């Protein structure tokens, strides 16, 4: 092997002290050994060591973990801060072991306390067992079992069949009535006619007609009962019969069954009383000595079993030749018709008399009538209504902003060719209690015959009579709403032409006082026939802002159509 060339400043004395250790030639000292020594780096003899040995400042030392240090004497010591976990303990810097029974410390050795069936065999803990407990081939503790025990599911179970069963994890006998438990003994509950004999057997108590025959309970029978085919039968004869397995009675009219009772069917005049069958007797019939007889009144008699007349006729009647006759005088006003043989009145129908519906009546001329007592009286003069109104004291009857929010009194009084009217308004609710509009109007519309026109469209701030309001001819303090023609109350269509409500000839203007307060004067305008057709009335008042719209009685007048 060719050695590297040595530098001039190389010191051949170990450890060579060359300034560049990497260039140290491979010179192995004669005392180098791999046992604790090594040549690292090459040409340098160093100490081979592992943890916890290390070097510090060129000196060999120990790596110290938690709880270890080197004291001032250079000795390795512990600061007793060793961390332990259960069951190891540390008390006063002494490490110990925490244990409980069955562990114990004997002769400074940890031992195990035990009782039978545990035992120590060859320094091993063992279990003393005997059959049926055994150890199987897998060194597992097992149990030798036989039917009815079973351990197929890993649990020791008792196999059972009815009437045995488990109830609340307890083996019990399952039973129901008539069985019950009496002092933990299974007992049979019995009631008469069952009983217990002296041998504690269940027996049957019976009395006639029951009997025991061939160890079977049977029935002693006598007529009309018989036993046939194991069934009890009833022998019957007419009028008794068996129908639908029921005993019945064969009956014919007039017998019938009412409310499950046998009864006699009767038709008038027969009836049923508490005492028996009876007959209702009408007029002319009576009972005499338990016989039905004819009750004869005056003028009748029985002759040879037949009813005959026994009359003493008084005038104008007479009884002659077995006939009752009427005598008629020549001046009586009565005549006998020879054809119909009827008595007629000989009336002079040309002088105030007539025959109507077979009655003699008086013929009445113009201006005469019959009063409620049937007397002839003079007919009263026909009275023409002169007033149309909403009654003297109406309920809320007008709608302005909401249904029935005002009460309106409107009166039209006919005076020859004029109508004098009045209108007043009482606010009831809503906006009318605090109005803010500039003007508020009330309108009435009429057909061409003068009758009230309902459901006519209105504009803002206008009120009309509600459909439920009362409007008609005055009748006392109320009104007759049967108004079929009231043209005579309507404004003249010539004087107040239609569709000219904005012109002066169709209007009237005056003043009134809101709420009747002289300090709140407001204008009042009446307009006639402002609508497109028919007749109309429109009344308009100026509004005081937020002041209740109560209008006192306002008067108006106009020329009528007729």
Curated annotation (Swiss-Prot):
Where does this chain mainly localize? virion
Q: A Pfam family name for this chain?
A: Adeno_knob
Q: Which UniProt keywords apply?
A: Capsid protein, Host nucleus, Host-virus interaction, Late protein, Viral attachment to host adhesion receptor, Viral attachment to host cell, Virion, Virus entry into host cell
Q: Where in the cell is it found?
A: Virion; Host nucleus
Q: Which GO terms describe its biological process?
A: adhesion receptor-mediated virion attachment to host cell; cell adhesion; symbiont entry into host cell
Q: Source organism's superkingdom?
A: Viruses
Checking InterPro entries in the record gives: Adeno_fibre (IPR000931), Adeno_fibre_knob (IPR000978), Adenobir_fibre_prot_rpt/shaft (IPR000939), Adenovirus_pIV-like_att (IPR008982), Attachment_protein_shaft_sf (IPR009013)
Q: Which residues form a coiled coil?
A: none
The conditions that induce or repress this protein are given as:
Expressed in the late phase of the viral replicative cycle.
Any GO CC annotation of this UniProt entry:
viral capsid
Establish whether keyword Ribonucleoprotein is in the entry: no
Keyword Cytoplasm part of the UniProt annotation: no
Tell me the protein family, please.
Answer: Belongs to the adenoviridae fiber family.
Q: How does it assemble?
A: Homotrimer. Interacts with host receptor CXCAR. Interacts (via N-terminal tail region) with pentons.
Swiss-Prot/TrEMBL domain comment: The tail region anchors the fiber to penton base capsomers, whereas the shaft, built from several repeated motifs, allows the knob to protrude from the virion.
| Role according to the record | Forms spikes that protrude from each vertex of the icosahedral capsid. Interacts with host receptor CXCAR to provide virion initial attachment to target cell. Fiber proteins are shed during virus entry, when virus is still at the cell surface.
Extra information: All late proteins expressed from the major late promoter are produced by alternative splicing and alternative polyadenylation of the same gene giving rise to non-overlapping ORFs. A leader sequence is present in the N-terminus of all these mRNAs and is recognized by the viral shutoff protein to provide expression although conventional translation via ribosome scanning from the cap has been shut off in the host cell.
Name this polypeptide is given: Fiber protein 1
């Amino acid at each position: 092997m060719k050695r590297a060339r040595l530098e001039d400043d190389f010191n051949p004395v170990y450890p060579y002290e060359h300034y560049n250790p990497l260039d140290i030639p491979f010179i192995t000292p004669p005392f180098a050994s791999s046992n604790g020594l090594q040549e690292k780096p090459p040409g340098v003899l160093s100490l081979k060591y592992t943890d916890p040995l290390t070097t510090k400042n060129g000196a060999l030392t120990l790596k110290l973990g938690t709880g270890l240090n080197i004291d001032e004497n250079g000795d390795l010591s512990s600061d007793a801060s060793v961390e332990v976990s259960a069951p190891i303990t540390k008390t006063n810097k002494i490490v110990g072991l925490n244990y409980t029974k069955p562990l114990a410390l004997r002769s400074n050795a940890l031992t195990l306390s035990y009782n039978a069936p545990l035992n120590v065999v060859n320094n091993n803990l063992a279990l003393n067992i005997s059959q049926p407990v055994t150890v199987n081939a897998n060194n597992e503790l097992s149990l030798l079992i036989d039917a009815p025990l079973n351990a197929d599911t890993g649990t020791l179970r008792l196999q059972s069949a009815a009437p045995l069963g488990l109830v609340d994890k307890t083996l019990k006998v399952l039973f129901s009535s008539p069985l019950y438990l009496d002092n933990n003994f299974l007992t049979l509950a019995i009631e008469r006619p069952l009983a217990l004999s002296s041998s504690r057997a269940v027996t049957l108590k019976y009395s006639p007609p029951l009997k025991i025959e061939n160890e079977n309970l049977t029935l002693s029978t006598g007529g009309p009962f018989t036993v046939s085919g194991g069934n009890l039968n009833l022998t019957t004869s007419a009028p008794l019969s068996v129908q639908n397995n029921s005993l019945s009675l064969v009956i014919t009219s007039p017998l019938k069954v009412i409310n499950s009772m046998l009864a006699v069917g009767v038709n008038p005049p027969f009836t049923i009383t508490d005492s028996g069958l009876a007959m209702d007797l009408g007029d002319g019939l009576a009972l005499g000595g338990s016989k039905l007889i004819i009750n004869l009144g005056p003028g009748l008699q029985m002759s040879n079993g037949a009813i005959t007349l026994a009359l003493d006729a008084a005038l104008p009647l007479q009884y002659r030749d077995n006939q009752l006759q009427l005598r008629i005088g020549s001046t009586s006003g009565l005549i006998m018709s020879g054809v119909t043989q009827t008595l007629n009145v000989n009336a002079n129908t040309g002088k105030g008399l007539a025959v109507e519906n077979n009655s003699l009546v008086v013929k009445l001329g113009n201006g005469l009538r019959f009063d409620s007592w049937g007397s002839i009286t003079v007919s009263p003069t026909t009275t023409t209504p002169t007033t149309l109104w909403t009654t003297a004291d109406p309920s809320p009857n007008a709608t302005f902003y909401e249904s029935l929010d005002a009460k309106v009194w409107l009166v039209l009084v006919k005076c020859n060719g004029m109508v004098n009217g009045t209108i007043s308004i009482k606010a009831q609710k809503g906006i009318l209690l605090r109005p803010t509009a500039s003007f508020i109007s009330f309108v009435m519309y009429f057909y061409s015959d003068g009758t009230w026109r309902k459901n006519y469209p209105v504009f803002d701030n206008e009120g009309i009579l509600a459909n439920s309001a009362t409007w008609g001819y005055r009748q006392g303090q109320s009104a007759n709403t049967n108004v079929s023609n009231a043209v005579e109350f309507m404004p003249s269509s010539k004087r107040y032409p239609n569709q000219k409500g904005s012109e002066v000839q169709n209007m009237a203007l005056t003043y009134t006082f809101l709420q009747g307060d002289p300090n709140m004067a407001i204008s009042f305008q009446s307009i006639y026939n402002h609508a497109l057709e028919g007749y109309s009335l429109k009344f308009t008042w100026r509004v005081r802002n937020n002041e209740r719209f109560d209008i006192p009685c306002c008067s108006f007048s106009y020329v009528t159509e007729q």
